[in-house]
Every structure is written in C-alpha cells, then in structure tokens.
Amino acid sequence: MKAIFTAFFLFLICNHIAGSVWAFDSQDLENFELLKICENCDLSEANLKYGDLKNAVLKNSNLEGANLHAADLSGADLTGANLKNANLSEADLNGAVLRGVDATGADFDNVNFLRADLREANLSTLDVSLERLEGATLCNTIIKSGTQNKNCR
C-alpha cells in the first residue's frame, strides 16, 4: 500500500512539473483570445484548432507543438515565431507573414500558402512541390528539397 501511495505521489509531482514546463502561459492565451495580438508570448502546446486567427499578431511567439489544424491565419503576422512540431495541417496562411520562423517538424499538410511571406523561414520538413508555393515569397527559405528563392524583392 505504501508503494502504491508513493508511486501515485511521484506521478502527481511529475505531471505537475511536466505541465509547468511544457504548457502554454494561460495569461498569454487569454490575452491573445481577447485581442488577437500576442508578441513574444508562450502559446506552446496550445489548442487553437479551427481558430479564427485572421490578421492575428504573433511575432516572436513560442507556438512549439501548438495545434493550429484548420486555423484561419490569413493575413497573420508570425514573424520570428517558433513553430517547431506545430500542427498547421489544413491551415489557411493566405497572405500570412512567416518571415524567419522555425517550423522544423511542423505539419503543413494541405496548407494554403498563397501570397505568404516565407522569407528566411526554416520549413525543412516541408515536402511540397514549388507549384503549391505559387505566389508565395521565398528568399533563403529552407524546404525539404533545399533552399529556395522565388519572388524575392
């Protein structure tokens, strides 16, 4: 019985520590949901699935592991954001600014990149034909097939 209690206690402590290390900042999320502006925020692991994030400002924010599946990020500014291992499948990035983002390991399945600014972005796990990136700005943009330069100004 003592062993079970000890194991349960250790489980609770580990969950608390892991939760505080890996979870988003709840105040950042609350402010973002209210204003759609959150620069330098910690929204790591946040569930923003199907979110209406049109024209949101998330400059230099931590969105590592965030769930942005089917989110409307059209016109959003994600300059310098950490999108490592984020789920952006089926997201709308039409006209979004992803300049300098690190999206290593992110899921971009069926994403709309029309008019997106992808300059200096690390999308190294993005396995996509250049036709799907038609209309996007690619300058020193890293995708799975290598560094791309297209529509540079």
Task: Kindly give the residue locations of the regions a language model identified.
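Cleavable N-terminal signal peptides
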Residues: 10-11, 21
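Positively charged n-region of N-terminal signal peptides that target proteins for export
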Residues: 1-8
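Tandem repeat scaffolds
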Residues: 24-153
